[in-house]
């Protein structure tokens, strides 16, 4: 399992967020994730689960955005 996937899964587990199915890398979505609601302002690698939740990972930090735009 790639390190960024492991970080995304660990963060989701830590906050009680259920990962839906498999996580798939979305390199075309990689980039700077900025905004006060996201809490990250740096280059992130993005993973998406089968439920449409996006996991933005930078270093050991992660933010999850669900299909409705809620940030976790």
Residue ranges and their predicted role:
Residues 2-22:
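Short, non-transmembrane alpha-helical segments in secretory-pathway proteins
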Residues 1-6, 68-72:
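Short intrinsically disordered terminal tails
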Residues 20-72:
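Acidic, low-complexity, intrinsically disordered interaction modules
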